[in-house]
Amino acid sequence: MGCLFFFALIDFPAGRDSPSLILPEGSYRQAHLWDDAANEARALRKLDFASEMERRVAAQLGRNAWFRPGLKIGAAVSGGADSIALLRMLSAARAELGIVASAVHFNHKLRGRASDTDEAFVAALAESLGLTLHIGHADVAAKAKQEKINLEDAGRRARYGFFEQLASQGVVELVATAHTMDDQAETVLAHVLRGTGIAGLAGIHPQAEHVVRPLLRFRREDLRRYLRAKKQLWREDATNRDSARTRARMRKKLLPLLEKEFNPMVVEHLAALSDRAREQALFVEQLAGQMSQKCVVLGGGGARIGVTELLHPLGIEDDEASGVLRARLIQEIVTRVRQRRGQISAAHIEAVVHFAKTGETGKRLQLPGGVDVLRQRAALVFFPRQ
């Protein structure tokens, strides 16, 4: 009887007939009871994992310097898995942390009906959680065409502009985005492949003005596991799977290859590299900011700096010793002119340095993002391209 009962619980491969077994009366019922118990155990493990994730995220929120009880914080929710997980966990932490949580959704109007469906999905979830929803809209395609920039830049500027608007109006104090450790690794790797310096290795910053990123210590798959445990649906943006996009290829092909063939901890190591680089970049950034205030003259929509001050910041004569500070100073100037520092790679910085050393008066150098550099005798002038 015991042997027959044991074999009755074996799972046989799909497509293969299981053998006929004659079980004693009551064995089927007992087998179902065991199945129910196993299912309950699995469900409990899922709930335990979900509770542990909520505990970890709440603890991470509480450790941040910007945290305080009563904080009004909005979760930026696109409808995708990561942002839905952020919203659910932020909602779960409300009572424990004493925060005022809300949802923030920005409709880019890029995917027609799908964009509107995303908005409706987020609205329904926010309502079910008892959270206020703040919605912004923009025709990002028209904005990109008008400003002569790509869709990604236009979308980011419109979206973050909306976040700043909410903060300036006092609707929220901070907006939390759902960038994960995987996003950090992808960003650092993308910068390395493009060519970058220490600022690029720093990757995604945990806080930038009114925007915070509390999930940078968490893996993307853990967030999906959390959602599955909560039986929570999410929306998928088809553009994230578009293999024509570099970021999508990196996510689907390159990083999995590196994890499988070289180091299963590559994502964690890239994220750790960004932490170390950020510490050093912050020091260099502070020095460059002081240099910029002292040596850069703003006027007429442009920024002017002497060639000597650019090539030898702080009077450092050695090219290699001054290289990091010089690169950050160029980044600082370009940011002042166009607010799009990210488009300037290490190769572009080298081009500016070469132009400063060899360029003739009246000559121009074009940089990406609509920035030109004009040589005026012993100075360089950075200005927006007309």
Segments (PLM) and residue ranges:
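Conserved anion/nucleotide-ligand pocket segment
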Residues: 256-266
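AMP-forming adenylation/ATP pyrophosphatase catalytic core
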Residues: 5-15, 19-82, 102-106, 138-140, ...
